[in-house]
């Protein structure tokens, strides 16, 4: 259970990274510098910081591809977990559960799993108290 929650948190973190807005390119920074005729030291520091972000674009490309692979595997695992839970919880056959899961969207599957594991975690926490 702990590993599933940690994996889910990592998937959410990688989703935020992959969907973040791309940094400005060095060419755009040069145009901004020419337009504003930087005399203020704070503006120069800000532009220098943005110039360093071009390295992040390369890293984002690497993590974007890695993220897609991780997300694909996580989706497959979630589908299998959802089918197993439906079979166990509702007492239906594996084929019926698979048909129900196939009809659900990815968001609905995530909510179904989070609801189940959230209740389970809450029960364990209340038992410890």
Curated annotation (Swiss-Prot):
Post-translational modification remark: Cleavage of the propeptide depends on the processing quadruplet motif (XXXR, with at least one of X being E).
The keyword ATP-binding belongs to this UniProt entry's keyword annotation: no
GO cellular component, one term: extracellular region
Record motif Processing quadruplet motif, residues: 57-60
Localization annotation: Secreted
Propeptide part(s) removed at maturation, as residue ranges: 21-60
Keywords: Antibiotic, Antimicrobial, Cytolysis, Hemolysis, Secreted, Signal, Toxin
Signal peptide from the UniProt entry: 1-20
First-listed, main subcellular location of the protein, grouped into a coarse class: secreted
Domain of life the protein comes from: Eukaryota
Keyword Zinc-finger included in the entry's annotation: no
Any one Gene Ontology BP term: defense response to Gram-positive bacterium
Name of a matching Pfam family: Latarcin
Tissue expression pattern: Expressed by the venom gland.
GO molecular function annotations of the record: toxin activity
Entry remark concerning the domains of this protein: Both the N-terminus (61-94) and the C-terminus (99-129) of the mature peptide form alpha-helices which probably disrupt target cell membranes. The linker region (95-98) probably derives from a processing quadruplet motif (PQM), found in propeptides of many zodatoxins, hinting at a fusion of two originally separate membrane-active peptides.
Purpose of the protein: Insecticidal, cytolytic and antimicrobial peptide. Forms voltage-dependent, ion-permeable channels in membranes. At high concentration causes cell membrane lysis.
Similarity remark: Belongs to the cationic peptide 06 (cytoinsectotoxin) family.
Protein known as: M-zodatoxin-Lt8b
Species of the source: Lachesana tarabaevi (Spider)
Gene name of the record: cit 1-2
